Amino acid sequence: MQVLVDADACPAVIKDMLFRAARRAEICVTLVANQFLRTPPSPFIKAVQVPAGFDVADARIVELVEAGDLVITADIPLAAAVLDKGAHALDPRGNWFSRENIEERLSTRAMMDQLRSAGIDTGGPAPFSARDGKAFASQLDRFLARHGKP
């Protein structure tokens, strides 16, 4: 089991939590981004830089992910692709993507895209909060307790 991170938009505090978890649980954490990422020295942490371009990092994550892996992303289409491969998907706010909720989330995303295309200001997500970080840490710990190294 490995953890893959859609790192371009992942909050720094979440990356730091993942770095600590990698060392503590001795699991591989791979950050994928289209920019250089500084990572702490560890045999369990690596960064993969992909060329700039629309969904290039997402495509690389889909290529690397295997059934049972965990992917950290807020990208709903990427989460859907990851679920299709039998992996798990968690957003940086501690919310799980699942077979039960992914279609609704894709539909909501499509509707919001249509509203924005029509010139309607739909706002954006709330700023990342300490509560979001705590929710993520809790879900990550639970996942690693169930699926981490034996």
UniProtKB/Swiss-Prot annotation:
Disulfide bonds: none annotated. Pfam families: DUF188. It comes from the Bacteria. InterPro entries: UPF0178 (IPR003791). PANTHER family: UPF0178 PROTEIN YAII (PTHR35146:SF1). This is UPF0178 protein Bcep18194_A4809. Belongs to the UPF0178 family. HAMAP family: UPF0178.
